[in-house]
Amino acid sequence: DRLAALRPAAPDFALMWDNAYCLHEVYGQFVPFRDMLTLCREAGNADMVYEFASTSKITFPGAGVAVMAASEANLKYLSGLLGAQTISYDKVNQLRHVRFLQDKAHVLELMQRHAAILRPKFEAVLAALRGIAPLGIASWTEPKGGYFVSCDAMPGTAKRTLALCAEAGVTMTP
């Protein structure tokens, strides 16, 4: 609600809403995020937000189908830009996705299969972090969805923490 109600000083301020993990539940059933487009419209900021998502972490990394949502005015503006930049979209890839994903029920079922694969990995990471909890050297999130655990180490330890993770074969996003 706070983001939607922003009153930016700059008239061209834009909220680029990355909704990449909108379907990525690791625990439980699908719970949709609040609709940022509607929240912004209701707050009088319909033209402030551009929302993006894709199927790249659902189907093929780097080869998914991207989507964008915005107000009618912003879509009209962007259509003019994209029309000059893009000759044609990859219609074969779009068709491949439509045939594979089919509908919302099939997408949600696929995401449950993804969650079954990822859940043990999340549990292993969280178990290791819980093991160091008594030391008080870090704090972390325990997400219900998405594909990231955010870990905050003690000040001044980031480089060494990243080096130790790399030695253990764990990839961290600094």
Please place each PLM-identified region on the residue numbering.
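Glycine-rich, phosphate-binding/catalytic loops in enzymes
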Residues: 31-35, 68-69, 166-167
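Conserved glycine-rich beta-strand-loop-beta hairpin in the small C-terminal domain of fold type I
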Residues: 112-126, 137-152
